From Swiss-Prot:
The protein's name: Thymidylate kinase
Gene: tmk
Entry function: Phosphorylation of dTMP to form dTDP in both de novo and salvage pathways of dTTP synthesis.
Pfam families: Thymidylate_kin
GO molecular function, one term: dTMP kinase activity
Keywords per UniProt: ATP-binding, Kinase, Nucleotide biosynthesis, Nucleotide-binding, Transferase
Organism: Vibrio cholerae serotype O1 (strain ATCC 39315 / El Tor Inaba N16961)
Catalytic reaction equation(s): dTMP + ATP = dTDP + ADP
InterPro entries recorded: P-loop_NTPase, Thymidylate_kin-like_dom, Thymidylate_kin_CS, Thymidylate_kinase
Length: 212
C-alpha cells in the first residue's frame, strides 16, 4: 500500500490532539509504523516562525485578514514541499493536525475572504495536492470554545467572537458534505465514543484502500 496523508480538522476544542493519537495508534495496529506527524501552521523552522506571527497579538498594528491568509499559505507551502511530500516519497504515512480545510473555514468562512481569492491562492500554493483522508471533528463553537478556555490562555484567533467560529463551522460543514474524502465525526460526544468512531472510520477506510 502506498503511503497516505491523513488530516484531522475541526474548531478549537474539538479534540484534535486526542484524535491524532488515536489515528497513529490505529495505523500502528495495522502494521503501519513509519509515520510523520505535522501541524499547521508550522512544522518547519520557518513555518513555526510564521505560525507565531499568525497566533500572537501585535500591539499597535492590526494584522490584516489577507496578510493572515498569506502567512498561513506561506507556512503551508514550506511544510508540504519540505516535509510532507518528501515523507510520502520515502513511504512514510503523514498524519496532520490541520491542512487547507482550516484556511477555507477560518479565513474563507470566518474572515469572509472572497471565494475566488481562496481558490486562486489554494491552486497557486498546492495545485492538485490534497489529503487522502480528512477526519473532520464537528462541534458547536460554544462548546468548543468552552473546552479551549479550560486549557488556559487563548491565542489571537481563539479570542475571536462566536460569530467568527459559527461562520467557520458553516464552511467546514459545506466542505465536509461536498467531498467524499472527508469523514465527519460528532465531537460533542464522550471521548470514549469519539475515539470509537474515529477508529471505526479509519479502519473502514483502510479496508477500502487495501482493496484497491
Amino acid at each position: 500500500m502506498n503511503a497516505k496523508f491523513i488530516v484531522i480538522e475541526g474548531l478549537e476544542g474539538a479534540g484534535k490532539s486526542t484524535a491524532i493519537q488515536v489515528v497513529v495508534e490505529t495505523l500502528q495496529q495495522n502494521g503501519i509504523d513509519h509515520i510523520t506527524r505535522t501541524r499547521e501552521p508550522g512544522g518547519t523552522l520557518l513555518a513555526e516562525k510564521l505560525r507565531a506571527l499568525v497566533k500572537e497579538e501585535h500591539p499597535g498594528e492590526e494584522l490584516q485578514d489577507i496578510t493572515e491568509l498569506l502567512l498561513v499559505y506561506a507556512a503551508r507551502v514550506q511544510l508540504v514541499e519540505n516535509v510532507i511530500k518528501p515523507a510520502l516519497a520515502r513511504g512514510e504515512w503523514v498524519v496532520g493536525d490541520r491542512h487547507d480545510m482550516s484556511s477555507q473555514a477560518y479565513q474563507g468562512g470566518g474572515r469572509q475572504i472572497a471565494p475566488s481569492t481562496m481558490q486562486s491562492l489554494k491552486q497557486t500554493a498546492l495545485g492538485d495536492f490534497k489529503p487522502d483522508l480528512t477526519l473532520y471533528l464537528d462541534i458547536d463553537p460554544k462548546l468548543g470554545l468552552e473546552r479551549a478556555r479550560g486549557r488556559g490562555e487563548l491565542d489571537r484567533i481563539e479570542k475571536m467572537d462566536i460569530s467568527f467560529f459559527e461562520r467557520a463551522r458553516e464552511r467546514y460543514l459545506e466542505l465536509a458534505n461536498s467531498d467524499d474524502s472527508v469523514v465527519m465525526i460528532d465531537a460533542a460526544q464522550s471521548i470514549e465514543q469519539v475515539t470509537a468512531d474515529i477508529r471505526r472510520a479509519l479502519q473502514d477506510w483502510l479496508s477500502q484502500v487495501n482493496r484497491v
